Amino acid sequence: MEPSHSNTGQSRSVDRKTVEKNRRMQMKSLYSELISLLPHHSSTEPLTLPDQLDEAANYIKKLQVNVEKKRERKRNLVATTTLEKLNSVGSSSVSSSVDVSVPRKLPKIEIQETGSIFHIFLVTSLEHKFMFCEIIRVLTEELGAEITHAGYSIVDDAVFHTLHCKVEEHDYGARSQIPERLEKIVNSVH
């Protein structure tokens, strides 16, 4: 009985060694992948693993700060643009204490045509976000457009949708109907 017990102990020891070896190989692979994502280090001498990890952590923190700055800049630009639009419509009585980050009269749509590509910008309130799905349905099912890009962003109570679609060059009838049909959908809410 004693010999079988020692074989089991050796087997467990080998299993642990194999597991540890696999773990080290996996960690080495993960470290390599992490370091490959960093901008190249200008130093000629290679960094130690702890230095590489510190550099990765610092780089991630720097990216987080940049993202937060860009979000703040976006919020400011949206507020500025909205204020300019409100003022250009003749709403000069807006006081500075009013939150202008969301346009007062929603939804709004802007359509730009570049050849057979339409760029559609839709701003809705959170309660009217269904309108985006309706616009996609009308474009694809009724007008035969092909959606090439769709996305949205939520800022405060506004949803900013962007949509790019392609209509065949020879299908002028559908192309001419797009602005009219989409504005009809948007204006049905007012």
UniProtKB/Swiss-Prot annotation:
Tree of life domain: Eukaryota
Protein location: Nucleus
GO CC entries: nucleus
Which Gene3D superfamilies does this entry report, sorted A to Z? Helix-loop-helix DNA-binding domain
Look up the record and give one Gene Ontology term from the biological process aspect: regulation of transcription by RNA polymerase II
| MF (Gene Ontology) | DNA binding; DNA-binding transcription factor activity; protein dimerization activity
Q: Which UniProt keywords apply?
A: DNA-binding, Nucleus, Transcription, Transcription regulation
In residue numbers, the region (Disordered) covers 1-21
Domain bHLH as annotated: residue spans: 11-63
Q: Does the keyword DNA-binding apply?
A: yes
Where is this chain compositionally biased, Polar residues type?
1-12
The family database entries (InterPro entries) matched by this protein are listed as: bHLH_dom, HLH_DNA-bd_sf, MASH1/Ascl1a-like
PROSITE patterns listed in its UniProt record: BHLH
Record-stated family: Belongs to the bHLH protein family.
For this entry, the protein name equals: Transcription factor bHLH162
Annotated organism of origin: Arabidopsis thaliana (Mouse-ear cress)
Q: What are the leading ranks of the lineage?
A: Eukaryota, Viridiplantae, Streptophyta, Embryophyta, Tracheophyta
